[in-house]
Amino acid sequence: MHSMISSVDVKSEVPVGLEPISPLDLRTDLRMMVPMVDPIMREKQLQQELLLIQQQQQIQKQLLIAEFQKQHENLTRQHQAQLQEHIKLQQELLAIKQQQELLEKEQKLEQQRQEQELERHRREQQLPPLRGKERGRERAVASTEVKQKLQEFLLSKSATKDSPANGKNHSVSRHPKLWYTAAHHTSLDQSSPPLSGASPPYKYTLPGSQDAKDDFPLRKTASEPNLKVRSRLKQKVTERRSSPLLRRKDGNVVSSFKKRLFEVTESSVSSSSPGSGPSSPSNGPTSSITESETSVLPSSIQAEHLVSQQRLLIQDESVNLLSLYTSPSLPNITLGLPAVQSQISASSSFKEKQKGETQTLRPGVALAGQYGGNLPPSSTHPHVALEGKPNSSHQALLQHLLLKEQMRQQKLLVTGAVPLHPQSPLAAKERGSPGVRAAHKLPRHRPLNRTQSAPLPQSTLAQLVIQQQHQQFLEKQKQYQQQIHMNKMLSKSIEQLKQPGSHLEEAEEELNGDHSMQEERAPASSASIRAESSSAGEDDRIGQQVGAVKVKEEPPDSDEDTQTQQMESGEQAAFVQQVIGKDLAPGFVIKVII
């Protein structure tokens, strides 16, 4: 606007009558001739020119805006068209890519199908010769051996039916499992040669006694390779069963002396009938089970077995400790057990006692690999409580350990000296004198007997030890409660005696009556120490102050509690002296009856 105004000012200086195109007149004469224009007219002209210029500017603005809008619309249209074209191109590219991927997948699938078809063709080409070879092998195996074995089995079966020894076969049929366990040393291979001319090359019993799994020779479709495989499997099973690692599952303690006894007894029993094979199991050790009513081993044979068993226990160094398992897979712990010499001496004493008891033994059931019968509990040892089981080694272990503990306790009570080895933690801990207890407080190292270790058998021994500990604890608790009760009653009686006006004559009469009653009851001895004290009566006279305290002690039943009761009597005497030393009322009397 300032530029326009300046231009208007410039134009106002030019005279109106003159045209702008006309050349300027520089003459001064003419100017003097032109009359002067009025200022009012000049202002009007200027205003008109300003209005015209403003109108022109508005028109130009409108034109410019219209052109700008047109160009903007054109540009937006072009841009949209370009965007649409770009989107179309992208869509086309995506479609092309998808088509290419689909084509590639189809090609891969076709290739896989072709490869599978080729593999099928190759397999089909290779299978016919293999099938032919297998058929040829199956046809090449001859079944004549199977037929021969079946014929031999039928012939032997008919021969056994005709044999007169039917009772023995019936006895074996009752216990087929025992026959198999007793004769496990025989060969299980069906192709093995027979041991005698009359017996077949394999074990059998009456029909129905065996299980269905053991009847594999009767299969009509069985071939020679199948029989070989099954016989090998059976041999492996028997080897595994005979291994010492898997016998621990039965829970029985198996040792070397058992095996020796089994061999000795088997040889001695089988020597009576030398011509017997595996087909006559009545001569084995199981015949004593089925025919115990008719034919029973005499007691002298069982006594010899027991004596030989004890000799083997003493001589064999590998069976020094009866309380330990002899399996080589697990080590044994010998903590709390004595040395070898004490155990051998205890076992020898046990052997001498068993010699006297063999005359009264009842013939028990002897399983395969277990001999010795059932040992009844001896009357001289009431603490031994054995269960009625066929495991003689376990019973011998219990008796041996209990005898050892009894001998140790007797030595401690008689001599009162310190033992060679400290007591086991399961035994009674506080039965000895105070000097023995002080000696036991210091730990002593003992040389180990064996390098193997295994947990001790958790059986009746542990139960007996736990019962002993429980009884000792109950006795101590009773004694402690009795002492507390006696102290309370003494303190009460002292307080009542100090008070004036207490009636003491009736209390003295009651005490005399109680004393006479207790002297009558004295022959019937009891195991516990009773302390009775009388409370002051209500009707005693004033001026007489006479008190009485009575402590009655009776001899204990057993020699084991003598030391503890002596200590308690010493404590009671000290307590009575303390009571006497106190400032009591005049005329106070203490009566102690022992």
From Swiss-Prot:
Ranges of biased composition (kind: Basic and acidic residues): 211-222, 236-247, 512-522
Annotated localization: Nucleus
Cellular component GO terms held in the UniProt record: histone methyltransferase complex
Stretches for region Disordered: 113-143, 187-247, 265-297, 495-571
GO terms under biological process: chromatin organization; heart development; negative regulation of DNA-templated transcription; negative regulation of transcription by RNA polymerase II; regulation of skeletal muscle fiber development; regulation of striated muscle cell differentiation
Reactions accelerated catalytically: N(6)-acetyl-L-lysyl-[histone] + H2O = L-lysyl-[histone] + acetate
Main location: nucleus
UniProt-listed Enzyme Commission number(s): 3.5.1.98
Catalytic EC class: hydrolase
Keyword entries, A-Z: Chromatin regulator, Hydrolase, Nucleus, Repressor, Transcription, Transcription regulation
Xref: Pfam families: HDAC4_Gln
Region feature (Interaction with mef2): 143-193
UniProt-recorded Gene Ontology molecular function terms: histone deacetylase activity, hydrolytic mechanism; transcription corepressor activity
InterPro entries: Hist_deacetylase_Gln_rich_N
Gene3D superfamilies from the UniProt entry: 6.10.250.1550
Biased composition (Low complexity): 267-288, 523-536
Family of the protein in this entry: Belongs to the histone deacetylase family. HD type 2 subfamily.
Role: Devoided of intrinsic deacetylase activity, promotes the deacetylation of lysine residues on the N-terminal part of the core histones (H2A, H2B, H3 and H4) by recruiting other histone deacetylases. Histone deacetylation gives a tag for epigenetic repression and plays an important role in transcriptional regulation, cell cycle progression and developmental events. Represses MEF2-dependent transcription.
Quaternary context: Homodimer. Interacts with mef2.
Protein name, as recorded: Histone deacetylase 9
